[in-house]
Amino acid sequence: MKHCLALHAGLLLGTSLLAPVTLAEVALFAADGYRQTQYRSPTPAALEGARTLDTAALQRLLHEQPHTRLIDVYRRTWLNGRFIEDEAHANLPGSLWLANTGDGQLEPRWQRYFETHLRNISQGDPDWPLVFYCRSDCWLSWNATRRAYHLGYRQLYWYRDGIDAWEQAGLPLVPAQPAELPGAFLTPNAAP
């Protein structure tokens, strides 16, 4: 019995000593403010530097400003220098899929990929309307919109409920493939 109590006390002490390490490892936000874990969880109603859109507002925007660019930031597995189609993905018609650019901390290649594609689709104009989205309750689009804001883009929109809301409204989705990650970006210090 004494041994059982000692073992139990030892386990409790060991668990309590490990708890702070575990909690520190799963911090929701990085020091620079980007969400870095639990990406599929409730998101805030607003985001600094961007206007939050529902489906009706997005449809109006696309009608009033047809040059608006839609940017899907849903993840896609990257392995051995290429995207792996582990599941079919569909997105809003006319979208550019910039996979893996909504993570909290981007490796340099993904940052270059993001910046280069934004510069290209906006024709270098920081006032070009850009709409970021993912799925509902997805922090990836929140991070990507915030990242674009910090890059100096000024006409930003966050389609908070994303693909799920579009589909629930009975609107069409199209099969999608992520934009290519240029081979030069695979080199750690390559310029865009």
Q: Model regions: which residues?
A:
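A polyampholytic, Gly/Pro-enriched intrinsically disordered region
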Residues: Y113-G124, P175-T187
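Positively charged, proline/Ser/Thr-rich regional signature most characteristic
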Residues: A57-W128
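Bacterial N-terminal signal peptides that target proteins for export
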Residues: M1-A9
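Catalytic cysteine-centered active loop of the rhodanese-like fold, especially the PTP/DSP P-loop
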Residues: Y113-W166
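Second-shell loop/turn segments in exported
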Residues: P42-G49, N100-P108, N120, F132-S136
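Active-site or metal-binding loop neighborhoods of secreted/extracellular toxin and effector enzymes
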Residues: Q155-R160, D164-E180, L186-A191
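Solvent-exposed loop/turn segments at secondary-structure junctions
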Residues: R75-L79, G102-G104, S136-L140, G162-W166, ...
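Flexible, polar/low-complexity N-terminal or interdomain linker segments that lie immediately upstream
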Residues: H8, L17-I84, A179-P192
